């Protein structure tokens, strides 16, 4: 009986190892770094923006996102769901599936634009743009309970959009995108102390996020026209700075990590990133160009919400404002684990031991979410990676109070990771670079015949002109630094002098030829310009004083009633004559080209031209003949 029990226990332990250690290593929820909402699903991606999973396929119109990093819960909104408005999603690593539960019941025609979560009081906050209100509700209560109103903007016509919770200082920030009265405001989580912190030079603010590492807020403003702006300020609205201004995008929501800002773009259906300004880091002496936004991923469907894993509980354990909040949240999680009152078998105890061994370096294991909370200075699914591992290239690494690696560089190197050599490219022409140990200043030990702070001057090439001039005029002045070089050139029997004569000619020859060439170019350009100006003036005068073509007017008589055919009328060609008559003036009939639109009888004109040519030809008689014949033809 004991042998059978031992075998069963061994099999159970093996089963536990395979089903706990492997899933935690391979299918842990820590595997994803970002989550974004498309129209009908939530995508989970890693830090290289490769899709590693998706969820919530049963929904049709997803929008806002919020993330509870303490319990690995995603909160999202569905605009089209009939019963629920906000839902929670938990990724189950053991069975590679997802559990979705309703968190807030739909109260009417809801339109959630922004969503935020407070892990201390376990409250959800969201902005309803259609009802112009900001609501909140506890996830510990039943989802059927109606939410409460924190801020009511309906009386002033406000349009709340993005919301963000400062969990350390217990404040709620939101953007109001009301046209011509847009603002960024904040209020205490208890509903007191509302104030407007940004109200100037702002058009349509959308997403907003709190950065606890720099104690600043970041928001995105969809400007009028084709531009948008990414701006930042301190938590009280002071020290406002423009981070980025770009165009041809429709930004919606924001997320932020240690060193990067992310936002969703509805126009390109994509996610973009931009480096976060280093507010709390010392500036390096390396010249860097202005970075450009980077498109990380794009999809066929519209993209709306985005959340990022920040490592909040690892990096803010020693922060002055956040330490107490982090401690209370961890204490609440530990109390949940200690409240298990059911009896535990030997297999369950062994399972707990394996779970504790799974998280390394003193990390805490969270059985509800199957993940590890790492201590300061470690990361990874099992907290197995030191933050200082291979971080500093030429220096010593230490973990700062914020939980980030910091490098102390060797005296010849600089940079955030000590990756830049101070002397790299400083000394020219094979000069040797020296670094002062006390001041850190750079100096160069130059080769022979090279001078300058960076060995940039070639004394041989510089003195060649003087030496050439000295050869022709022995009494000429030569700088003291060129005396030895000229003696060497003289001893070489003119070989080096001839070589440097082509490379560095005397100052009297080079500039004169250059000046003569410049004078010729200026003269040619001036003559051509003058001729062109004269041609333009002559052409203008011709257009002004050119005689106008004569305008010809003729008057014809038209009778109202036709008479009977007379003997002089020919069949099919007689024209009626009128007893009552009126005058019709035809103007400028024959001013057209006679070759294209003749208004004469060609045979008759030909006879007239033949008779005229036998006499003296006259151009002015042509129009008279044309009009005369046309008048006779019409009257007959």
Swiss-Prot record:
Cytoplasmic side, ranges: 539-636
Signal peptide location: 1-27
Membrane topology category: Single-pass type I membrane protein
UniProt-recorded Gene Ontology molecular function terms: Wnt receptor activity; Wnt-protein binding
Main localization category: membrane
GO biological process, one term: canonical Wnt signaling pathway
Keywords from the named record: Cell membrane, Differentiation, Disulfide bond, EGF-like domain, Glycoprotein, Membrane, Oogenesis, Repeat, Signal, Spermatogenesis, Transmembrane, Transmembrane helix
Transmembrane segments: 518-538
GO CC field: plasma membrane
InterPro entries noted in UniProt: 6-blade_b-propeller_TolB-like, Cueball_EGF_LRP_Nidogen, EGF-like_dom, LDLR_classB_rpt, LE_dom
EGF-like domain span: 350-384, 419-456
Ranges in the topological domain labelled Extracellular: 28-517
SS bonds (residue pairs): 359-372, 374-383, 423-433, 427-444, 446-455
Compartments where found: Cell membrane
Superkingdom assignment: Eukaryota
SMART domains found in the cross-reference section: EGF, LY
LDL-receptor class B repeats: from-to residues: 122-169, 170-214, 215-260
PROSITE patterns per UniProt: EGF_1, EGF_2, EGF_3, LDLRB
Glycosylation sites: 83, 109, 190, 285, 339, 449, 458, 493
Known function: Has a role in spermatogenesis and oogenesis.
Family, as annotated: Belongs to the cueball family.
The protein's name: Protein cueball
Organism of origin: Drosophila virilis
GN (gene name): cue
């Amino acid at each position: 009986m004991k042998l059978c029990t031992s075998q069963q226990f061994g099999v159970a332990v093996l089963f536990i190892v395979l089903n706990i250690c492997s899933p935690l290593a391979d299918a842990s929820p820590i595997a994803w770094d970002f989550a974004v909402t498309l129209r009908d699903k939530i995508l989970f991606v890693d830090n290289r923006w490769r899709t590693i999973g998706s969820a919530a396929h049963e929904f049709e119109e997803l929008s806002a996102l919020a993330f509870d990093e303490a319990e690995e819960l995603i909160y999202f909104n569905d605009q089209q769901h009939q019963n629920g408005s906000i839902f929670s999603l938990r990724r189950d690593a053991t069975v590679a599936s997802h559990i979705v539960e309703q968190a807030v019941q739909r109260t009417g025609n809801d339109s959630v634009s922004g969503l935020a979560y407070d892990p201390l009081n376990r409250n959800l906050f969201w902005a309803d743009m259609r009802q112009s209100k900001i609501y909140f509700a506890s996830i510990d209560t039943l989802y059927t309970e109606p939410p409460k109103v924190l801020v009511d903007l309906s009386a002033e016509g406000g349009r709340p959009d993005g919301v963000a919770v400062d969990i350390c200082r217990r404040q709620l920030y939101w953007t109001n995108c009301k046209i011509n009265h847009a603002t960024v405001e904040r209020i205490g989580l208890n509903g007191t102390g509302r104030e407007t912190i940004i109200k100037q030079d702002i058009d349509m603010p959308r997403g907003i996020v709190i950065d606890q590492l720099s104690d600043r807020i970041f928001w995105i403003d969809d400007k009028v026209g084709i531009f948008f702006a990414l701006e930042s300020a301190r938590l009280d609205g002071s020290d406002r700075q423009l981070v980025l201004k770009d165009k041809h995008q429709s930004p919606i929501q924001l997320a932020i990590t240690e060193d990067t800002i992310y936002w969703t773009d509805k126009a390109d259906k994509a996610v973009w990133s931009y480096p976060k300004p280093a507010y709390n880091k010392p500036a390096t002496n390396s010249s860097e160009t202005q970075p450009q936004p980077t498109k990380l991923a794009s999809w066929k469907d519209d993209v709306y919400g985005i959340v990022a894993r920040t490592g909040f509980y690892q990096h803010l354990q020693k922060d002055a404002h956040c330490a107490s909040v982090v401690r209370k949240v961890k204490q609440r999680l530990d109390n949940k684990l200690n409240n298990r009152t059911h009896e535990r078998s030997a297999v369950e105890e062994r399972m707990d031991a394996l779970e504790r061994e799974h998280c390394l370096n003193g990390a805490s294991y969270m059985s509800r979410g199957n993940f590890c909370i790492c201590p300061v200075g470690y990361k990874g699914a099992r907290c197995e990676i030191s933050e200082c591992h291979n971080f500093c290239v030429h220096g010593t690494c230490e973990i700062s109070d914020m939980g980030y690696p910091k490098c102390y560089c060797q005296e010849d190197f600089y940079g955030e990771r000590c990756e830049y050599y101070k002397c790299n490219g400083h000394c020219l022409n094979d000069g040797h670079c020296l670094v002062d140990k006390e001041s850190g200043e750079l100096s160069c030990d130059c080769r022979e015949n090279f001078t300058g702070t960076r060995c940039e001057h070639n004394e041989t090439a510089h003195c060649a002109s003087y030496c050439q001039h000295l050869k022709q005029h022995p009494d000429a002045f030569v700088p003291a630094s060129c005396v030895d070089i000229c003696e060497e050139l003289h001893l070489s029997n003119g070989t080096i002098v001839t070589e440097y004569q082509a490379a560095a000619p005397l100052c009297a020859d080079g500039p004169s030829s250059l000046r003569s060439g410049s004078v010729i170019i200026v003269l040619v350009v001036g003559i051509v310009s003058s001729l062109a100006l004269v041609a333009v003036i002559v052409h203008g005068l011709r257009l002004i004083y050119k005689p106008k073509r004569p305008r010809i007017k003729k008057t014809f008589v038209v009778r109202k009633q036709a008479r009977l055919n007379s003997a002089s009328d020919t069949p099919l060609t007689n024209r009626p004559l009128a007893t009552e008559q009126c005058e019709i003036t035809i103007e400028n009939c024959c001013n057209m080209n006679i070759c294209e639109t003749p208004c004469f009888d060609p045979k008759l004109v030909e006879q007239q031209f033949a008779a005229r040519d036998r006499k003296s030809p006259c151009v002015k008689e042509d129009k008279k003949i044309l009009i005369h014949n046309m008048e006779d033809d019409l009257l007959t």
